[in-house]
């Protein structure tokens, strides 16, 4: 289980609950991070990042 929230999540990454329900897309650009609260959205279990560079 990852610890993040929609605001702090990486832009271009989709966040899902444990049963595969889409929750949100991340809003924070790695090159220009948003000022986000550091809390864990307990609904978020994993992410998929189809548009991220690298992996």
Swiss-Prot record:
Keywords: Disulfide bond, Protease inhibitor, Secreted, Serine protease inhibitor. Disulfide bonds join 3-40, 6-24, 7-36, 13-49. The keyword Glycoprotein does not apply. Coiled coil: none annotated. It is found in: Secreted. InterPro entries: Prot_inh_I20, Protease_inhibitor_I20. The record marks 38-39 as: Reactive bond for trypsin. Its main location: secreted. Pfam families: Prot_inhib_II. GO terms for molecular function: serine-type endopeptidase inhibitor activity. GO terms for cellular component: extracellular region. Gene3D superfamilies: 3.30.60.30. Potent inhibitor of trypsin and a weaker inhibitor of chymotrypsin and pronase E. Belongs to the protease inhibitor I20 (potato type II proteinase inhibitor) family. This is Proteinase inhibitor PSI-1.1. It comes from Capsicum annuum.
């Amino acid at each position: 289980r990852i610890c993040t929230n929609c605001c702090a999540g990486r832009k271009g990454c989709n966040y899902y609950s444990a049963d595969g329900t889409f929750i949100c897309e991340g809003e924070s650009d790695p090159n220009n991070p948003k000022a986000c609260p550091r809390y864990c959205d307990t609904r978020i279990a994993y992410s998929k990042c189809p548009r991220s560079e690298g992996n």
